[in-house]
Amino acid sequence: MVNGLNASTMVKVLNKTLNFEKGNGLLPTVVQDVDTKDVLMVAWMNEESFHRTLETKETWFWSRSRQELWHKGGTSGNVQHVVSMALDCDGDTLLIQVKPEGPACHTGRTSCFFNEVERS
């Protein structure tokens, strides 16, 4: 269950409000640590990765560079267990709160957001 709903109920509810069309079949997806509230990463979901995420309760994304489904942690073991999912007001961006098993970033850092932007 995600947010207290089973996957099939969640799909019925969200399919009515998900807007994959705006992003040419992709939804930008913000992944947040449910405990620390840190933003871990931003990735892209297509309909298949969205459904796999609901079914497995682990995050799946669409790799734009490799043009394939990507199970986060499938190779590294750094999976992300889904706690909750929420859509923004337009239905075109997804927020997923997770319990991560290890770092989210391929650099080994907890978050992909570690590059400070300097002000001039």
Identify the function of each model-found stretch:
Residues 4-26, 32-40, 45-120:
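C-terminal binding/interaction regions
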